[in-house]
Amino acid sequence: MLNEIKLSLQYILPKQWLTRLAGWGASKRAGWLTKLVIDLFVKYYKVNMSEAQKPDTASYRTFNEFFVRPLRDEVRPLNTDPNVLAMPADGVISQLGRIEGDKILQAKGHNYSLEALLAGNYLMADLFRNGTFATTYLSPRDYHRVHMPCNGILREMIYVPGDLFSVNHLTAQNVPNLFARNERVICLFDTEFGPMAQILVGATIVGSIETVWAGTITPPREGIIKRWTYPAGESDGAVALLKGQEMGRFKLGSTVINLFAPGKVELVEHLQSLSVTRLGEPLAVSVEAVAADVAPAVISQEEADAEREANPLVDNDQNR
């Protein structure tokens, strides 16, 4: 009965308004009130502040500053094996495994469309059909910066407006096509392991999604798909990120979905649904040995041009 009420509220509550309100409040400097809210949050969610660079809650001027708090370097050592892809975030594995054609597992008995997740971009979807995916849920207590699993050259970013359903075990089991319905930012990279997509999925009270190269992507929420393209490696203006480097963050939290091309990587065997993830630990292993100094493979210009022609979204300059 309680779960039915919670699910009904997902469709009734004004999620966009609540999200704007939460984002507004989280960005305000309110002195003792800010500290009180942070202290209550830490206590309720059992946040481990000893891992933070600034463990004293009084050192945060806003709730957002606290929420995206950086960790001390030594608490999340990075696996430096060039054949290992690292966890992009702290959290819990929601689902992972093989992409069956166009179908990605959302929860037991529930699939959603790869192409729908990628905003109907069928050429991008073709890169990942029958590939591998991993969905990581970031709970309120977790570190909310997202990092690179491997070295990568950014080739494309797409902002997809959408719903703002809460993302949790209950909604994953009961809201059809949850991740393909919610607001999200899709980032496509060239890597040593072929193309990789890292998708930041929004949710109720996720005030903003940011990337390190473009800053705040949302808000504003204008209701239109936006697309940015970026040059290949070695080109002027290329955005190159290293394994373990921060690539984005949530204010407040949600979900990261990673997509890998078929035949390129194998997920670490012990990982399963509800496995706890820690940034920098092994997520997957290359099918073929990769030398440490190999440059990321790139999507050809012909493929990139064909994709742009097939998906005439709202294009923006990368220097936005």
UniProtKB/Swiss-Prot annotation:
The record marks G253, S254 as: Cleavage (non-hydrolytic). Its EC number is 4.1.1.65. Heterodimer of a large membrane-associated beta subunit and a small pyruvoyl-containing alpha subunit. HAMAP family: PS_decarb_PSD_B_type1. It catalyses: a 1,2-diacyl-sn-glycero-3-phospho-L-serine + H(+) = a 1,2-diacyl-sn-glycero-3-phosphoethanolamine + CO2. Its cofactor is pyruvate. Disulfide bonds: none annotated. It holds the Pfam family PS_Dcarbxylase. It is a peripheral membrane protein. GO terms for cellular component: plasma membrane. Binds 1 pyruvoyl group covalently per subunit. Belongs to the phosphatidylserine decarboxylase family. PSD-B subfamily. Prokaryotic type I sub-subfamily. Keywords: Cell membrane, Decarboxylase, Lipid biosynthesis, Lipid metabolism, Lyase, Membrane, Phospholipid biosynthesis, Phospholipid metabolism, Pyruvate, Zymogen. It comes from the Bacteria. GO terms for molecular function: phosphatidylserine decarboxylase activity. Pathway: Phospholipid metabolism; phosphatidylethanolamine biosynthesis; phosphatidylethanolamine from CDP-diacylglycerol: step 2/2. Is synthesized initially as an inactive proenzyme. Formation of the active enzyme involves a self-maturation process in which the active site pyruvoyl group is generated from an internal serine residue via an autocatalytic post-translational modification. Two non-identical subunits are generated from the proenzyme in this reaction, and the pyruvate is formed at the N-terminus of the alpha chain, which is derived from the carboxyl end of the proenzyme. This is Phosphatidylserine decarboxylase proenzyme. Its main location: membrane. The modification Pyruvic acid (Ser) is found at S254. The active site is at D90 (charge relay system), H147 (charge relay system), S254 (charge relay system), S254 (schiff-base intermediate with substrate). GO terms for biological process: phosphatidylethanolamine biosynthetic process. Residues 301-320 are annotated as: Disordered. The gene is psd. It is found in: Cell membrane.
